[in-house]
């Protein structure tokens, strides 16, 4: 994670970063308001997102910036960036290129819906796979 924040813009200080220097981010399709995905950003990722108008996240597993679509081509063009009332969650209103945001090949990462009751329910996939992930990631 980039700990050199001196050269980053002062407006980043308004965001309430967690103890790891991260903030949760929701990506939402600008045209439909569909919630596409949840991810994390550090200061550098948020600044890069504003600068490029493309979604850049911070990968906690890879411990580096993750340019959405860098492998798949499924980039997110950012139309608007919002900060919630507590200043601890970022919302990106995006155009999802190719319509696929999820690594499973679906439009949204939120493709599983709970059906049933507390005693007899389960999660059911309610969105189709638009493209086989094996053909997305080579």
UniProtKB/Swiss-Prot annotation:
Binding of Zn(2+), residues: 85, 102, 109
Pathways involved: Amino-acid biosynthesis; L-histidine biosynthesis; L-histidine from 5-phospho-alpha-D-ribose 1-diphosphate: step 3/9
Domain of life: Bacteria
GO terms for biological process, alphabetical: L-histidine biosynthetic process
Keywords: Amino-acid biosynthesis, Cytoplasm, Histidine biosynthesis, Hydrolase, Magnesium, Metal-binding, Zinc
Any one annotated GO CC term: cytoplasm
Residues holding Mg(2+): 84, 86, 88
Assembly information from the UniProt record: Homodimer.
General function of this protein: Catalyzes the hydrolysis of the adenine ring of phosphoribosyl-AMP.
Protein name per the record: Phosphoribosyl-AMP cyclohydrolase
Source organism phylogeny: Bacteria, Pseudomonadati, Pseudomonadota, Betaproteobacteria, Burkholderiales
